[in-house]
Amino acid sequence: MGWLRKKKKPKSDIASERGAKLLEELIECCDGKSNPIKFFSADEILKATNDFSDSNFVLRLEVPFKWYSGKNENHPMILIKKDVGWWSGLRVDRLCRDIAVSSMVSGHKNFMKLVGCCLELDYPVMVYHSVKKHYKLEISEQPWKKRMKIAEDIATALAYLHTAFPRPFVYRILSHWNILLDEDGVAKLTDFSHCVSIPEGETFVRVDRDVGLYSYFADNYVRSGLVSDKTDVFAFGIFMGHRLLLGYEYYFEHYRGEEEESEDGFDSLMKRHARNLLSTLKEDRPMEEIADSKMIEKMGQISEQERCQMKAFLKLSLRCTGPSEEVPTMVEVAKELNKIQRSLFNDSSSLSSGQTQLDSAQDISSTVVLSN
């Protein structure tokens, strides 16, 4: 009955099909004007990684990616990202989108520098230039100053995606799983497999399915599949306030065991979470009681300047998740984060209440309604 079995395609045909799809993505994303990338053979990758040996394994950020170190004649240090997930036509599309966008942004300090890829292997890989060691982001281990720096780095990366190209790119899947830290503490955003571009002259695009962490989803994204730059701003606001400052893993961690009060569980959940944060601010509770307890324990004592920074940081995160018409752009968020770090120590009196330039024009209480 062997004749009934589906004949397996030769690897050369598979690589050619993937290459054709990648060319389509390069043309769609950047009119074919991306940074040059090298196509590695399967033998080159296997030799560089010692057949993906355990000794070359570096880290695993999330399913389905594994990262390996390697080297070859032209690159003494490279990082190889291997997708070990189940392969389908949809996954090939995502891989090609990841390669295309990575090739566009690889010159920026907050992205990995793409060298090339290998499409011949059963599980295709992407190859990055790496002169420094890179680590998985473990937020619980980071002190406050480094958390602020991580926030600014990722805000800068997202702002670049939104503004550096003729058509804005929306990242969509922000989470700590997609962030690497190099040995100097510079945060780098990875995995552009779900990036979507907004057509010229438009402010949003509609997608068939939402992807990412449910607790990071903006309202319009969940209800209507509408994606705009504000989709990333909302997710970043959650990442700032809930992960970097408060140390929450997910919304559900904070509300575990509670029953929803309405049929619209998502809407109820989001509004209740916003009210919780707002009441925390209005009650003027000490930051020692609000911020990530692990971080506070390591700090020992919070200075007045650090307390002001944390309050400004939290208020900015609330602005990011506030009413759609008043949500800042990622460029504004990145600038404000830089300001919080640099000028707060020089002008603590003007920011003693944690007020930021972005929230001075509006009562913070209006952020109860999350209408992104």
UniProtKB/Swiss-Prot annotation:
Boundaries of every Protein kinase domain copy: 1-314
Keywords for this protein: ATP-binding, Nucleotide-binding, Phosphoprotein
Modified sites of kind Phosphotyrosine: 128, 221
Highest rank taxon of the organism: Eukaryota
Region feature (Disordered): 348-372
Positions bound to ATP: 1-4, 38
Gene3D superfamilies: Phosphorylase Kinase, domain 1, Transferase(Phosphotransferase) domain 1
Biased segments, Polar residues type: 354-372
BP term (GO), one: cell surface receptor signaling pathway
GO molecular function, one term: ATP binding
Cystine pairings recorded for this chain: none
UniProt xrefs under PROSITE patterns: PROTEIN_KINASE_DOM (PS50011)
SUPFAM superfamilies in the record: Protein kinase-like (PK-like)
Family: Belongs to the protein kinase superfamily.
Record note on domains: The protein kinase domain is predicted to be catalytically inactive.
Protein name, per record: Probable inactive receptor-like protein kinase At1g65250
Organism of provenance: Arabidopsis thaliana (Mouse-ear cress)
Lineage: Eukaryota, Viridiplantae, Streptophyta, Embryophyta, Tracheophyta
